[in-house]
C-alpha cells in the first residue's frame, strides 16, 4: 500500500528582536525546539531580527537561528535598517533580496499537484523609518524569479501589504502596497508571509492568502495578543495555517482551498475581549463579561 507524500511544511517567524530588553531566551529555545520537531521544508524569517540594527544584535540573532535545522529564507525589517544595520544584515545573512526554489520528488509533485515551491523575498525597509516600500524598479526582478508556472508561489516581506486589525494607526502598509498586490495576484502567487506589528492575522484577497505573524520572543505585545509563531502546511487540498503559542498550544488559524483559491475558515483566537482591548468593539456595560 502506497504511503501519502509529505505535505509542504513551512515555519514563519518574525520580530524576534534580539537586543530588546524584553527578549525571552526561554521562549526562543522553545520555538527552536518545536520547529526542529516539525522538520519543516523551509523556515521563513520575515524581519525585525534585532532591536536597533546593531552588529552585536545581528550576531546574536545569527547564533540563535543557526540552531534551526532547516533551510532558511531571511529578510530584514524596519528595526534591522536602523543605524545602517542593513550592512550588518548582509554580512550575517546575505542579500536583502533573494529567491529560493526547491523541486519536489516525482511522487510528491504528483500528490501535491505542483512541481515544487518558489519563495521570493524582498527588503521593504527604509533606513531609520518605520514605514517602507518595495519600489517599482524591483517589480521586473520579482516577476523574473517566479519562472515555474506549476510551483507553489510564496512571497516574503516584513511590512504589511494589507492593514491588520488591532495594530493602531494604519501607516504600516508599504507605500506601493496596491501595485505590489496587483503584481502578485497577476503572477498567481499563493501565499504572502509578513510580520511587523506583532499581531497574527490572515487575509484572503483575490486568491492570495496573506499570513501575518506575531512575535514569539518578546513582551512587546498589543492588547491581549499572546506571543506566537506560525506553521503553514500545504497539502493537495488546502493551505492550512496554525498558530503556536508559548504555552505549547497549536491552533488551526485559517484554511485556504487550493483549487478554488478561497478562504474556507477564517478567524482564530481573536475574541471579543481582544477586539475590545484594541478599541475595535465597544467595552461591555459594567457587570457584563466579554465573550472569550
List the model feature ranges, each with a label.
Residues 2-11, 109-121, 148-152, 205-210:
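Beta-strand-turn-beta hairpins that frame and shape the catalytic cleft
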Residues 235-292:
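A short C-terminal boundary segment appended to hydrolase-like catalytic domains
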Amino acid at each position: 500500500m502506497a504511503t501519502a507524500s509529505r505535505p509542504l511544511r513551512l515555519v514563519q517567524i518574525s520580530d524576534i528582536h534580539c537586543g530588546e530588553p524584553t527578549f525571552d531566551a526561554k521562549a526562543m529555545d522553545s520555538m527552536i525546539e518545536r520547529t526542529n520537531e516539525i522538520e519543516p521544508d523551509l523556515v521563513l524569517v520575515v524581519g525585525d531580527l534585532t532591536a536597533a540594527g546593531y552588529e552585536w544584535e545581528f550576531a546574536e540573532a545569527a547564533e540563535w537561528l543557526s540552531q534551526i535545522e532547516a533551510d532558511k529564507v531571511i529578510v530584514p525589517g524596519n528595526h534591522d535598517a536602523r543605524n545602517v544595520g542593513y550592512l550588518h544584515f548582509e554580512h550575517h545573512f546575505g542579500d536583502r533580496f533573494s529567491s529560493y526554489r526547491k523541486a519536489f520528488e516525482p511522487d510528491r509533485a504528483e500528490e501535491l499537484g505542483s512541481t515544487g515551491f518558489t519563495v521570493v523575498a524582498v527588503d521593504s525597509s527604509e533606513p531609520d523609518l518605520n514605514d517602507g516600500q518595495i519600489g517599482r524598479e524591483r517589480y521586473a526582478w520579482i516577476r523574473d524569479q517566479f519562472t515555474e508556472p506549476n510551483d507553489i508561489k510564496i512571497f516574503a516581506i516584513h511590512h504589511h501589504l494589507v492593514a491588520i486589525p488591532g495594530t493602531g494607526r494604519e501607516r504600516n502598509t508599504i507605500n506601493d502596497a496596491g501595485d505590489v498586490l496587483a503584481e502578485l495576484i497577476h503572477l498567481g502567487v499563493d501565499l504572502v508571509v509578513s510580520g511587523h506589528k506583532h499581531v497574527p492575522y490572515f487575509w484572503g484577497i483575490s486568491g492570495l492568502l496573506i499570513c501575518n505573524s506575531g512575535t514569539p520572543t518578546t513582551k512587546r505585545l498589543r492588547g491581549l495578543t499572546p506571543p506566537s509563531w506560525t506553521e503553514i502546511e500545504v497539502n493537495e487540498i488546502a493551505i492550512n495555517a496554525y498558530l503556536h503559542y508559548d504555552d505549547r498550544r497549536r491552533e488551526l488559524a485559517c484554511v485556504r482551498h487550493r483549487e478554488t483559491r478561497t478562504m474556507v475558515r477564517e478567524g482564530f483566537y481573536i475574541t471579543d475581549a481582544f477586539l475590545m482591548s484594541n478599541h475595535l468593539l465597544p467595552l461591555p456595560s459594567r457587570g457584563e463579561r466579554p465573550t472569550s
